[in-house]
């Protein structure tokens, strides 16, 4: 819990109350889940959310990437270097990602794009064995045998604790490039902040900018 209207600010934790003249909000974001059957049970057993982190564990195997934006397309391209087959599954009939990325992924022989399709269920007991698919246009159901499912459908900011305390936009904290929010003395850094690009390098930059702003504020 946070009490930002007072001075000093109060950060209430399970270990006690922390008093501070300034607070930096940097709680990050987590991958958005599909919310389908067996997704959470098989996480780490074939279900993954980071191709660059886990892709090498699927060398020579067949995998599916779910999504249609830049991240999904880049994940499919990355995995094509390790996997024998990559199925790129998108619920629409065209990608949202950059045209240059689309052309590259379409040219790779071991990537197959499956359009207008959603994943309804991930099948397997101890590990991923297959996925159940539904074509949204034809209502045709099918099952695809894969050993891995990489989910790339966006991220969700961890900002519930800040709701109502600072101005927000679709769950993200509205903050300037120097990290300043709508509340004096409160700053935001990393994936919680409104910005066009969310990567490790931009999060690190945000942290440096926010701390510099705190120093100036104090």
Question: Where in this protein do the model-derived segments appear?
Answer:
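A Rossmann-like FAD-binding core segment of flavoenzymes
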Residues: 1-12, 17-20, 81-177, 216-218
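Phosphate-coordination loops involved in phosphoryl transfer and adenosine-cofactor binding
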Residues: 15, 59-61, 116, 183
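Generic hydrophobic/aromatic pocket-lining and core-packing "Φ" positions
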Residues: 76-77
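N-terminal Rossmann-fold NAD(P) dinucleotide-binding loop
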Residues: 72-73
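Glycine-rich Rossmann-fold phosphate-binding loop(s) that bind the pyrophosphate
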Residues: 67-69
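FAD-site-proximal beta/loop scaffold in flavoenzymes
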Residues: 30, 35, 40-57, 151-202, ...
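Redox-cofactor binding/interface segments in oxidoreductases and associated redox assembly factors
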Residues: 13, 25-26, 65, 151
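A structural signal for the hydrophobic beta-strands that form the central parallel beta-sheet
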Residues: 25, 49, 113-115, 145, ...
């Amino acid at each position: 819990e946070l009490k930002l209207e007072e001075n000093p600010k109060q950060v209430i934790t399970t270990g006690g109350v922390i008093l501070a003249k300034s607070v930096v909000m940097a709680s990050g974001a987590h991958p958005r889940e599909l919310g389908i059957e067996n997704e959470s049970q098989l996480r780490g057993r074939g279900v993954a959310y980071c191709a660059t982190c886990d892709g090498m564990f699927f060398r020579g195997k067949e995998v599916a990437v779910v999504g249609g934006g830049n991240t999904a397309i880049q994940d499919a391209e990355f995995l094509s270097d390790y996997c024998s087959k990559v199925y790129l599954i998108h619920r629409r009939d065209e990608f949202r990602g950059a045209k240059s990325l689309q052309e590259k992924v379409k040219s790779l022989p071991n990537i197959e794009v499956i359009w207008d399709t959603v994943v309804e269920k991930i099948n397997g007991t101890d590990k991923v064995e297959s996925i159940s698919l539904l074509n949204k246009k034809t209502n045709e159901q099918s099952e695809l045998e894969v050993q891995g499912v990489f989910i790339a459908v966006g991220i969700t900011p961890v900002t519930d604790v800040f709701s109502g305390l600072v101005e927000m936009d679709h769950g993200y904290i509205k903050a300037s490039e120097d990290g300043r929010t709508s509340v004096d003395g409160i700053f935001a850094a990393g994936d919680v902040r409104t910005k066009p690009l969310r990567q490790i390098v931009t999060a690190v930059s945000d942290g440096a900018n926010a701390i510099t702003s705190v120093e100036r504020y104090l």
